[in-house]
Regions:
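Conserved nucleotide-sugar donor-binding catalytic segment
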Residues: 2-4, 8-97
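C-terminal, non-catalytic tails of nucleotide-sugar-dependent glycosyltransferases
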Residues: 65, 88-128
Length: 128
């Protein structure tokens, strides 16, 4: 992440999170991703905050685990006009054994309803 385009902070190599669909995004923003021609599934225009993680989930469901480069190659600029910086009501939290993150309750309910089949087992087709 960077605020000035020069200095970086919170550097982290991307990785898949077991709670990705619920907003535990350790991959980064969509600008950190690339897709083979003809594979991109588009974004759900009913959500703002979870728009990227929901896309990553659908892509994995259809195409399998993405290839992830274990290196810091991109710095996202942080600024006050980011979608996640304003215009989203963070009114709920989700926790697992190691982290807690903020979410929008209406969006997470949309996710739980839209992907209810996934939440039965929390398994992807590429997992045994």
């Amino acid at each position: 992440h960077t605020t000035d385009g020069v200095e970086t902070h919170r550097d982290c190599a991307p990785k898949w999170s077991s709670r990705m669909l619920e907003g535990d995004n350790l991959l980064g923003s969509p600008s950190c991703t690339a897709y083979l021609n003809g594979t991109y599934l588009g974004m759900d225009d009913q959500i703002k905050l979870l728009i990227d993680t929901e896309l990553y989930h659908r892509m994995r469901m259809k195409h399998g685990m993405p290839f992830i480069l274990d290196d810091v190659l991109i710095a996202n600029r942080e600024h006050n006009n980011r979608v996640s910086a304003g215009g989203v009501d963070y009114d709920a939290t989700i926790s697992d054994s190691s982290r807690t993150w903020l979410v929008n309750k209406a969006e997470i309910e949309h996710i739980y309803k839209k992907h209810s089949d996934y939440f039965v087992t929390r398994k992807y087709p590429d997992e045994t």
